[in-house]
Amino acid sequence: MTRIRRGGYVFVTWVGDHPPRHVHVYRGGRLLIKWDLERRQTIVGTAGPRLRDIIVALQEEERL
């Protein structure tokens, strides 16, 4: 399991998790979204521009 904190959010991924490759995003211990890392879109929930920017930055840094 990988856990990254940034911008008040916690990003969690699991090795071997079901497809598509995705990240779970939490804030205050509550799941906000599941984000498809391949298609760069939400699977569950709604992501605002700030959160999308953080996810893209983490992908560009190869952290996700």
Predicted regions and their residues:
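Metal-centered catalytic cores of metalloenzymes
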Residues: M1-L64
